[in-house]
């Protein structure tokens, strides 16, 4: 069953939170996978302890008691949503994470960033798809286990998901081709790839592939580190190695089988609609929640598999390793809709690289 939130007046909250700052700041502890228990939903003191512990875990600080009260109220409302949904769903689950003090509108405004005005760009013809005639596919593929996926990164409050999606795909094909896994620079794309893309205000992966080809490669992250904001382009770095690609290809649109064919050979850049509230608090399982196909977030597909009869795609996100399954999400495939869950089959592409 779902539980009702404890009722507090704003004055009571001010008093309780002010006191809890002194009494509860040392209550950091390990929680269950979802981060709360039923007691937190029915006992105000326990809920305040949970909030303080969550603040400590995620290094949260607020400018005033009033701001803290507001964030506590948002936190409590989000917790009610998480608990309600966990009582309604069974293939995946939600949990508290670093976004628990953000309203859903705040979350969407800060962490999504695919360039919507460019969606009408012409995609490559299906005849260019190099994996079109492949028929013998493995039942599952996980490029993490093959060493072709770099550690999960965190885009922060910069709408640069498109850059992280691009880089993940390039890191993957570079490792597959050369045997070397190098973490590459999203910041270079944000700062320098400005002809069609817009830094922290969104972009598209195909345009980023074009930039990498035209400039002769992408710097490594150590040579051009991430800032979580737009910077000045430092494209011309002498005597610094770049990772190159030969080209890129689009996966045939709205074709689940074609996406799997590509994934059997390399990580793939994909776009999804990630603005659903369940996506904000996804913690684990095979996600099959409500979402449309209004693409707003760039991610990387890094494998596929099946669990308890449910087929899924393994997706690498860019919201840090504490979101989802250590930064990844398993998204249901074979949904019966050509565009796939959350539109994942609509705008997939991958870089190419010759040995």
Curated annotation (Swiss-Prot):
Transmembrane segments: none
Disulfide bond sites: 158-200, 192-233, 291-342
EC number: 3.4.22.-
Record's signal peptide: 1-28
GO biological process, alphabetically ordered: programmed cell death involved in cell development; proteolysis
Catalytic residues (positions): 161, 297, 317
GO CC field: nucleus; plant-type vacuole; plasma membrane
Compartment list: Vacuole; Cell membrane
Keywords on record: Autocatalytic cleavage, Cell membrane, Disulfide bond, Glycoprotein, Hydrolase, Membrane, Protease, Signal, Thiol protease, Vacuole, Zymogen
Tissue expression summary: Mostly expressed in roots, stems and flowers. Confined to tracheary elements, and specifically to xylem.
GO molecular function: cysteine-type peptidase activity
Cross-referenced PROSITE patterns: THIOL_PROTEASE_CYS (PS00139), THIOL_PROTEASE_HIS (PS00639)
SMART domains given in the database record: Inhibitor_I29, Pept_C1
Glycosylated position list: 180
Post-translational modification as stated in the protein's UniProt record: Autocleaves.
Repressor is among the record's keywords: no
Family annotation (CDD domains): Peptidase_C1A (cd02248)
Pfam families named among the record's database cross-references: Inhibitor_I29, Peptidase_C1
Propeptide position ranges: 29-136
Function (record text): Cysteine protease involved in xylem tracheary element (TE) autolysis during xylogenesis in roots. Participates in micro autolysis within the intact central vacuole before mega autolysis is initiated by tonoplast implosion.
Family: Belongs to the peptidase C1 family.
Name under which the protein is recorded: Cysteine protease XCP1
UniProt organism field: Arabidopsis thaliana (Mouse-ear cress)
Classification of source organism: Eukaryota, Viridiplantae, Streptophyta, Embryophyta, Tracheophyta
Underlying gene: XCP1
């Amino acid at each position: 069953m779902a539980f009702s939130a404890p009722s507090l007046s704003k004055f009571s909250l001010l008093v309780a939170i002010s006191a809890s700052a002194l009494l509860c700041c040392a209550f950091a502890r390990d929680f269950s996978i979802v981060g709360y228990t039923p007691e937190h939903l029915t006992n105000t003191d326990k809920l305040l302890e949970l909030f303080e512990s969550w603040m400590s875990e995620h290094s949260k600080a607020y400018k005033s008691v009033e701001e803290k009260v507001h964030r506590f109220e948002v936190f409590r409302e989000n917790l009610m949503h998480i608990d309600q949904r966990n009582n309604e769903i069974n293939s995946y689950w939600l949990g508290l994470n670093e976004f628990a003090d953000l309203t859903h509108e705040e979350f969407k405004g800060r962490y999504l960033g695919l360039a919507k005005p460019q969606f009408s760009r012409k995609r490559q013809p299906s005849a260019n798809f190099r994996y079109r005639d492949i028929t013998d596919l493995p039942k599952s593929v996980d490029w993490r286990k093959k060493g072709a996926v770099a550690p999960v990164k965190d885009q922060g409050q910069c709408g640069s998901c498109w850059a992280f999606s691009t880089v993940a795909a390039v890191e993957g094909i570079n490792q597959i081709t050369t045997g070397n896994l190098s973490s590459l620079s999203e910041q270079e794309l944000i700062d320098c790839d400005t002809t069609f893309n817009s830094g922290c205000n969104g972009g598209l992966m195909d345009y980023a592939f074009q930039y990498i080809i035209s400039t002769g490669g992408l710097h490594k992250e150590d040579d051009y580190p991430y800032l979580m904001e737009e910077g000045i382009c430092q494209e011309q770095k002498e005597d610094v190695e770049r990772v190159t690609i030969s080209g890129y290809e689009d996966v045939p649109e709205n074709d689940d089988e074609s996406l799997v064919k590509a994934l059997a050979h390399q990580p793939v850049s994909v776009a999804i609609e990630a603005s659903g509230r369940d996506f904000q608090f996804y913690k684990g399982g095979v996600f099959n929640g409500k979402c449309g196909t209004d693409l707003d977030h760039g991610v990387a597909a890094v494998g596929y598999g099946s669990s308890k009869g449910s087929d899924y795609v393994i997706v690498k996100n860019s919201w840090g390793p504490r979101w989802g399954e250590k930064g990844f999400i398993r998204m249901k495939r074979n949904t019966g809709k050509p565009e796939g869950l959350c539109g994942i089959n609509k705008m997939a592409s991958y870089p190419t690289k010759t040995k």
